[in-house]
């Protein structure tokens, strides 16, 4: 029969599945539901593949009368046992005749078939080898049985994947056609003999006996039809031929002579090994259930040669086949087209290709392993020739049983030193001989305290290279230095010292941890400075943050507030000594719980700080805390009447200090002491008072030698309102700010004679005095006069009465630079007129911030400086004044309207800012002076950019920006970083 290595993946899988059921010798009843396929591989790797090509599916019903006897002949040992498939003895001539019969059978499925007719028996001869030997060295016992057991499978997919019947598969002698009747009669006789023993064999097939028999040809031929014992008519050949035509038999045999010899050698070696093991006495087996001799021999054999020989490479065929399996892409595609092509030239499906590769991969490639023979030879030689060595080796391994965990315990390789060898366990077998050096597990625990006691010196020593013995510090133990010397002397020991390296790395980490713990016990300087009571607590009692539902508050902020709460609760306890007690533990626990509740409720950092401060105020009972809460209990911004300061007390340093503490001074809180003007909040009422008592002439200020006007102005150098060199020359003090684009100018009118030429002033003194007397002269705190009505006289030059009235009704709108240049022309005249225009705008600007002392003071100083410049340019001033008419001056009602209009916008802005940061003041995060300073600065900054606004609608669009600006000023006030801005 022609040999073709063709099979299917399904057949291979089924052979494994069914063989698992029959590996104990049990027979399995064949119940088929449709097409089937049988794959049988015997002991010599000969495969019999049977599949249906054109079978009759209508006759594939289940049958209970088809026996499946399998006889498994067991040898003395289960390891050497192999199953023999008993086949009927038929000569080669009968097989050839049957092949010829199959060739002549018709393929028409529509031919007459009788359901009651007997089935012809188609037999395929399995070549009987004289000495079948199983190669069992690469398979387990069950796998060996599975390999030799008949595999039966019922599947409906076989008809889809099976190939068409080829005449070459069943080719035989064409001249033996006269022997067909004889073959058929012999088949029928055999069938009748089999059916007579139906009942007994059927029961045997279900019993799990070890001596059951299987007729492989009944599996191959059986279709599950009912057998009729009374009808054995040989005349109905068409149905028999049709049924036989549905079977395709392939015998695949690949058993080279070298493999047969290797299998015989393997079997011989195994028998010798068993005999050597059986010579052991029973006492040794009782002492140890595992055979120590065999175990040591197998260990030595599996480990391979101890010399530096290169490992034996696998065979070239195995490597080539493996590459072929793993190779993908075009190369594999072209190869498979050539290798797995059909007879018609078409390529087989991937299913068939993979099936064939899997079949031969498991049967042929793995079977040719000379390493197995070498392993068995080495085991046998160790058992026979070296019994003493195995005993000594085993005796050296027995101490591991007393402490087995150390032989399996590996230290993590976290060291920074290079690794020259693989990691070793703590208790390596080779280190057991000299237990004094390496073997004791207690040495690790002894070495760690010694190294950790060195603290900082051990860190330095571990940082240096360990293999240099001369770089040992004083704190390093003598053990480590001696070990390092040994490492230098014996380079081979470097590979075995991973454990000591790991110990030193652990010691370094432990030393660092010890330093941290001592610092915690002593208390960090930050805790001592800010939280003295908390610093006295033991380190394990200090509060730690509880987990919150969200992370909207930074951890650093939470930790600070937790310390603050704990410190406050410890103060509340009034303990003489801070130690571990019920009171301290309760205070710490309360602080942790309170902080966690606040953190869960808070949606932002500001809210969190507010709630923490409220909680501290709520728990406060001491007198100092009550005194601190009292100014917060009332409204943070008291009524303007209670905040008014009379001019009589303005020079008193005690009053100034009180005003500064209350936040009513112009300077920010906590600023250094200096002579500061204390200005009332509402400038209009103070102006009314000073008009009655102030001097009539502006130049009478010379009679008051101590009078001075201080103020800080920030001018952008690139702004159009910057006065330039004239202002800088006349300034008494000029101080640069942090940024290069700003200049801080302090204006003074103490000695106007220094800055003015007396001859220039006397020239037009009468005209100037007359015009100034007609205006409303303001005095602030009895120190300075401010001309209020010079602007309309200057405006009369170009615009007339309508311009003044329009500006009065419009809320004090400031003219732009372009308008000023149109009205008054470029050059030096602009220095005269523009300050007067902006001085007129003071009616609106000053009224916008009556509650902010800093802003009003700034504007008044601005007006005073304008008056000084007016005196400088006095020659040109009368020309513009002479052109003005008294009727063009705005009335007091118009000025009142402008004041009220600007005042309302400023009040709205200020109220908006107060509403945002008032909770911080009430809760104690910032005090009153910081609160007032932040409100003043924020309002001043906002109104600087919205000075022309006619309504407060810009708060809708820019509310968030204003809030952020206010928060920045609050942070500046609380940190004290703003002091340098105000210090001189």
UniProtKB/Swiss-Prot annotation:
Residues 422-496, 622-697, 755-786 are annotated as: Disordered. Residues 486-496, 641-651, 679-692 have a biased composition (Basic and acidic residues). Residues 466-485 have a biased composition (Polar residues). Residues 450-465 have a biased composition (Low complexity). It comes from the Eukaryota. This is Uncharacterized protein At4g10930. The lineage of its organism: Eukaryota, Viridiplantae, Streptophyta, Embryophyta, Tracheophyta.
């Amino acid at each position: 029969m022609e040999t073709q290595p063709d099979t299917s993946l399904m057949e291979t899988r089924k052979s494994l599945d069914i063989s698992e059921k029959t590996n104990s010798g049990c027979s399995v009843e064949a119940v088929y539901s449709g097409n089937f396929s049988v794959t049988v591989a015997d002991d010599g790797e000969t495969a019999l593949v049977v599949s249906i090509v054109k079978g009759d599916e209508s006759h594939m019903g289940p049958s209970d009368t088809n026996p499946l006897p399998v006889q498994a002949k067991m040898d003395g040992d289960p390891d050497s046992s192999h199953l023999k498939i008993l086949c009927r003895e038929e000569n080669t001539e009968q097989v050839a005749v049957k092949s010829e019969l199959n060739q002549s059978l018709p393929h028409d499925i529509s031919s007459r078939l009788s359901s009651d007719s007997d089935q012809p028996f188609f037999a395929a001869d399995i070549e009987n080898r004289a000495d079948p030997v199983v190669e069992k060295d690469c398979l387990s016992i069950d796998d060996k049985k599975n390999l030799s057991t008949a595999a039966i499978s019922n599947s409906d997919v076989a008809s889809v994947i099976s190939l068409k019947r080829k005449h070459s598969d069943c080719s035989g002698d064409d001249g033996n056609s006269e022997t067909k009747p004889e073959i058929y009669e012999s088949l029928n006789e055999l069938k009748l003999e089999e059916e007579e023993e139906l009942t007994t064999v059927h029961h045997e097939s279900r019993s799990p006996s070890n001596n059951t028999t299987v007729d492989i040809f009944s599996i191959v031929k059986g279709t599950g039809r009912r057998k009729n014992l009374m009808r054995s008519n040989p005349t109905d050949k068409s149905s028999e031929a049709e049924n036989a035509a549905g079977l395709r038999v392939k015998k695949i045999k690949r058993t080279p002579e070298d493999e047969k010899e290797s299998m015989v050698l393997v079997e011989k070696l195994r028998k010798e090994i068993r005999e050597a093991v059986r010579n052991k006495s029973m006492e040794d087996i009782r002492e140890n259930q595992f055979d120590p001799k065999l175990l040591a021999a197998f260990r030595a054999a599996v480990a391979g040669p101890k010399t530096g020989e290169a490992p034996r490479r696998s065979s070239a065929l195995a490597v080539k086949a493996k590459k072929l399996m793993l190779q993908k892409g075009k190369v594999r595609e072209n190869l498979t087209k050539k290798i797995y092509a059909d007879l018609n030239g078409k390529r087989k499906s991937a299913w068939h290709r993979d099936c064939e590769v899997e079949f031969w991969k498991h049967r042929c490639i793995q079977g040719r392993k000379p390493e197995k023979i070498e392993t068995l030879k080495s085991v046998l030689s160790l058992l026979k020739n070296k019994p003493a060595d195995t005993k000594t080796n085993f005796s050296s391994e027995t101490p591991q049983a007393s402490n087995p965990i150390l032989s399996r315990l590996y230290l993590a390789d976290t060291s920074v030193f290079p690794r020259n060898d693989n990691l070793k366990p703590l208790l390596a077998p080779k280190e057991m001989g000299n237990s004094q050096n390496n073997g004791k597990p207690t040495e690790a625990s002894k070495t760690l305290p010694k190294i950790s006691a060195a603290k900082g010196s051990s860190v330095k020593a571990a940082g240096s290279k360990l293999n240099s013995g001369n770089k040992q510090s004083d704190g390093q133990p003598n053990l480590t230095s001696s070990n390092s010397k040994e490492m230098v002397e014996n380079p081979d020991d470097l590979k075995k010292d991973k454990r000591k390296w790991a110990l030193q790395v652990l010691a370094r980490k432990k030393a660092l941890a010890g330093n941290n713990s001592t610092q915690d016990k002593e208390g960090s300087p930050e805790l001592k400075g800010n939280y003295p009571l908390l610093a006295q607590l033991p380190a394990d009692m200090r509060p730690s943050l509880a987990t919150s539902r969200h992370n909207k508050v930074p951890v650093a902020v939470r930790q600070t507030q937790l310390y603050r709460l704990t410190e406050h609760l410890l103060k509340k306890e009034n303990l003489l000594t801070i130690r571990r007690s019920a009171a301290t533990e309760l205070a710490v626990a309360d602080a942790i719980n309170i902080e966690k509740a606040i953190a869960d409720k808070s949606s932002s950092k500001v809210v969190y700080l507010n709630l923490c401060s409220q909680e501290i105020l709520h728990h406060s009972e001491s007198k100092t805390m009550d005194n601190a809460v009292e100014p917060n209990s009332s409204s943070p911004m008291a009524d303007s009447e209670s905040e008014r300061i009379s001019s009589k007390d303005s020079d008193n340093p005690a009053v100034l200090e009180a005003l500064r503490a209350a936040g009513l001074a112009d300077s920010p809180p906590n600023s250094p002491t200096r002579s500061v003007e204390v200005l009332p909040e509402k400038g209009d009422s103070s102006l009314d008072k000073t008009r009655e008592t102030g001097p009539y002439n502006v130049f009478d200020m010379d009679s008051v030698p101590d009078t001075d006007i201080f103020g800080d102005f920030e001018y952008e150098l690139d702004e159009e309102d910057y006065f330039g060199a004239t202002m800088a020359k006349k300034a008494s003090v000029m101080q640069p700010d942090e940024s290069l684009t700003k200049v801080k100018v302090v204006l003074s009118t103490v000695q106007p004679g220094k800055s003015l030429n007396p001859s220039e002033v006397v020239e037009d003194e009468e005209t100037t005095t007359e015009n100034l007397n007609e205006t409303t002269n303001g005095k602030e705190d009895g120190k300075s006069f401010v001309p209020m009505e010079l602007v309309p006289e200057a405006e009369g030059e170009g615009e007339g009465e309508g311009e003044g009235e329009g500006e009065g009704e419009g809320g004090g709108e400031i003219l732009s630079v372009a308008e000023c240049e149109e009205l008054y022309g470029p050059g030096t005249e602009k220095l005269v007129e523009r300050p007067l225009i902006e001085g007129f705008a003071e009616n609106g600007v000053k009224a916008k911030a009556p509650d902010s002392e800093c802003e009003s003071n700034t504007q008044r100083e601005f007006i005073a400086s304008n008056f000084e410049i007016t005196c400088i340019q006095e020659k040109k001033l009368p020309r513009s004044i002479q052109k003005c008419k008294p009727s063009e001056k705005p009335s007091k009602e118009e000025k009142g309207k402008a004041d009220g209009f600007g005042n309302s916008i400023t009040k709205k802005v200020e109220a908006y800012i107060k509403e945002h940061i008032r909770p911080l003041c009430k809760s104690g995060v910032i005090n009153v002076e910081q609160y007032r300073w932040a409100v003043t600065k924020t309002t001043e900054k906002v109104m600087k950019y919205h000075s022309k606004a006619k309504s407060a609608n810009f708060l809708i669009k820019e509310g968030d920006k204003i809030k952020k600006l206010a928060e920045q000023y609050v942070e500046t006030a609380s940190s004290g970083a703003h002091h340098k801005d105000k210090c001189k």
